[in-house]
From Swiss-Prot:
Any one GO molecular function term: ATP binding
Name of the protein: tRNA-specific 2-thiouridylase MnmA
Region (Interaction with tRNA): 145-147, 307-308
EC numbers: 2.8.1.13
Any Gene Ontology biological process: tRNA wobble position uridine thiolation
Site feature (Interaction with tRNA) residues: 124, 340
CDD domains xrefs: MnmA_TRMU-like
A GO CC term attached to the entry: cytoplasm
Cystine pairs: 99-195
Annotated region described as Interaction with target base in tRNA, given as residue ranges: 94-96
């Protein structure tokens, strides 16, 4: 058997199936590899075995070799432990970003090279182009499916060794191709959410690792509204799962999470989705990663997303001495959440991004002050 030049990450879904089919149709020397990133915990919520069988079937139809690698230990150590630590610290992490950086474009890429390949391919909706003497990460043609947000931590080395064969396709086109070519995954439902949680209640899953720490739910005026099981089970802007019944002298309107204070174990809520406590015009990030290797300038304008599938928001970015960013938005932003990813764009090009550290939302400023006081006491 000839040594494959490209190893395709086969997830068992329609996207990676069509990615492999397109490369195979171009007579590229390819093989497929299925990654197991989570060990089934007995709840039957992670469909890894079903996905593996589908990946095997597609590789068989295409006549390409199939490989399997278990990265569950690496995933636990490099993604999941960070995921838990962030929630324990009251932040809302994005494990997909870390999984791409540490697993798919690190361990998987290393494995592909061990198998003799010099490139990898995945079913991501994104594009890579080379011009002006460097590699550029671009949005996928289907803006509703674009995944460049989750790929912003990639650099020049990874892009040089990566192919995104379906980045120029719309999802509907892709499914039609899969159906026309007889791929068994053509009608398979898209995966959503995080595999290790599946269809389970998120809070119940998190309780297995972060035991409940009940505390008070208060409104912006510090009036007690109800009790919560743990502030780390909630995120800014959340409406569901608060279990707040009728409150005396309050209208029967829904409540929204507007802030959390770990130092006092208080969860703050308000009855207005457009509450001023959910609005911010400024954020500071942790040190940023740049796809090109460096920022465009010490200060520059671009657009940003602070959550996946958000519309582009114009902003001014200032790079601080430690590599972190100060970002001033042209318009007020809703529920900008520490722990989530800030991703920067110049048109369709993804420049890079960073983890959001703090904002100028009123309760976030209070949280930062209380946290600083707590740290000073501990010191």
């Amino acid at each position: 058997m000839n040594t494959p030049r490209i190893i395709v990450a086969m997830s068992g879904g329609v996207d990676s199936s069509v990615a492999a089919w397109r490369l195979n149709s171009q007579r590229e020397a390819i093989a497929g590899l299925f990654m197991r990133n989570w060990t089934d915990d007995g709840n039957g919520q992670c469909h890894a075995e079903e996905d593996r069988r589908d990946a095997v079937a597609v590789c068989g139809i295409l006549g390409i070799a199939f490989h399997f690698r278990d990265f569950s230990h690496e995933y636990w150590q490099e993604v999941f432990t960070h995921f838990l630590a962030e929630y324990a610290n009251g932040r809302t992490p994005n494990p997909d970003v870390l999984c791409n950086r540490e697993i798919k474009f690190k361990h998987f890429l290393e494995t592909a090279r061990e198998l003799g390949a010099d490139r990898i391919a995945t079913g991501h909706y994104a594009r890579i182009e080379h011009y002006r003497q460097r590699w550029h990460l671009l949005r996928g043609a289907d803006r509703s499916k674009d995944q460049s947000y989750f790929l912003h931590q990639l650099g020049q080395e990874q892009l040089a060794a990566t192919l995104f064969p379906i980045g120029d396709l719309e999802k509907q086109q892709l499914r039609q191709l899969a159906h026309q070519t007889g791929l068994p995954t053509h009608a398979k439902k898209d995966s959503t959410g995080i595999c290790f949680i599946g269809e389970r209640n998120f809070r119940e899953f998190l309780k297995q690792y972060l035991p409940a720490q009940p505390g008070e739910i208060r409104d912006p005026q510090e009036q007690r509204i109800a009790e919560h099981p743990g502030v780390f089970y909630f995120t800014l802007g959340q409406r569901q799962g608060l279990n707040i019944g009728g409150v005396r002298n309050r209208p029967p309107s829904p409540w929204y999470v507007i802030g959390k204070d770990l130092a006092t174990n208080v969860l703050y809520v308000d009855q207005h989705r457009d509450s001023p406590f959910l609005q911010s015009r400024w954020l500071r990030s942790e040190p940023a990663h740049w796809v090109s290797g460096s920022p465009p300038a010490p200060t520059f304008t671009c657009t940003a997303q602070t959550r996946y599938r958000q519309a582009d928001e114009p902003c001014k970015v200032t790079v601080r001495n430690d590599g972190s960013l100060d970002v001033d938005f042209t318009r007020t932003q809703w529920a900008v959440t520490p722990g989530q990813s800030l991703v920067l764009y110049d048109g369709n090009e993804c420049l890079g991004g960073a983890v959001i550290a703090t904002t100028d939302a009123p309760l976030e400023r209070k949280r930062a002050r209380n946290l600083s006081k707590t740290e000073n006491v501990l010191q």
